[in-house]
Amino acid sequence: MSLALRSELVVDKTKRKKRRELSEEQKQEIKDAFELFDTDKDEAIDYHELKVAMRALGFDVKKADVLKILKDYDREATGKITFEDFNEVVTDWILERDPHEEILKAFKLFDDDDSGKISLRNLRRVARELGENMSDEELRAMIEEFDKDGDGEINQEEFIAIMTGDI
């Protein structure tokens, strides 16, 4: 095996290992979602609880997805899965997400009028939805800080730069 190929494999293995770990915050979100939607507190979640928990974590799950998860992980045929199984499924799904695609989805949540830009109005709506009581002056300052082309709005390229720390 050539030295170049060997070092490429080492780099690839390192990248893969790095990518295969959740942050502590992500781990806590998974635990919180399970506990929140385990409505009967029996330490297992059924079809409906699983579907809602997955959606709360940002997954657009279809009925077939939820049924497959239950089929694959419900070893005792109870119609439920445990936290350990839920954690395994959700961890895999989170690690398979494309970060760039997730950033574009987030941009679309702000850009509800499909203008291709985040305006003061868009930012005000999101702040209000998140329970943030911010003045227009504060919101304008946020836009100005990241508005590299000076048009008074945040375009997709500027948003990606914000989210990836390239600003």
From Swiss-Prot:
Coiled coil: none
Keywords, alphabetical: Calcium, Cell cycle, Cell division, Cytoplasm, Cytoskeleton, Metal-binding, Mitosis, mRNA transport, Nuclear pore complex, Nucleus, Phosphoprotein, Protein transport, Repeat, Translocation, Transport
GO biological process: cell division; centrosome cycle; microtubule cytoskeleton organization; mRNA transport; protein transport
Parts of the chain that traverse the membrane: none
Compartment annotation: Cytoplasm, Cytoskeleton, Microtubule organizing center, Centrosome; Nucleus, Nucleolus; Nucleus envelope; Nucleus, Nuclear pore complex
Chief place where the protein resides: cytoplasm
Pfam families: EF-hand_7
Domain EF-hand: 25-60, 61-96, 98-133, 134-167
GO molecular function, one term: microtubule binding
Modified positions (Phosphoserine) in chain numbering: 135
Alphabetical list of InterPro entries matching this protein: CALM/Myosin/TropC-like, EF-hand-dom_pair, EF_Hand_1_Ca_BS, EF_hand_dom
Record-level GO cellular component terms: centriole; centrosome; ciliary basal body; cytoplasm; microtubule organizing center; nuclear pore nuclear basket; nucleolus; photoreceptor connecting cilium
Residues engaged in binding Ca(2+): 147, 149, 151, 153, 158
Subunit relationships: Monomer. Component of the nuclear pore complex (NPC)-associated TREX-2 complex (transcription and export complex 2), composed of at least GANP, 2 copies of ENY2, PCID2, SEM1/DSS1, and either centrin CETN2 or centrin CETN3. The TREX-2 complex also associates with ALYREF/ALY and with the nucleoporin NUP153. Interacts with USP49.
Function: Plays a fundamental role in microtubule-organizing center structure and function.
Stated family: Belongs to the centrin family.
Protein name: Centrin-3
Species of origin: Homo sapiens (Human)
